[in-house]
């Protein structure tokens, strides 16, 4: 009986672990350095951050300074791009997926996206936001 319980535990344990979702790693360039992470973070100063698509749940944060953030593809559901403080330029060439967010945050920002199925929010300051279609941006003055 002990062997049967042990064998059953070995069979059930991997199945239980496989049910836990994992985030895919996003590959970006931050100021010319390759970063592979689910949470890509810039510096307190001005940054140039370029990425392909963001996997569901992944995040890119510019932090302070006048950041240039370019996502060449789409944002998966729940992915977040944060400009941070400073006058940021944030562009998402593809679709902003459901539950995904593009946040300009503090100061005046320029945000441009493809179709917005999530949320585009300019934040505080005078923000210029352009979305190709879908949900309209909020907290954008122009």
Question: Language-model features: where?
Answer:
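Extracellular, beta-strand-rich repeat scaffolds characterized by small/acidic residue-biased motifs
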Residues: 44-46, 53-55, 64-66, 73-76, ...
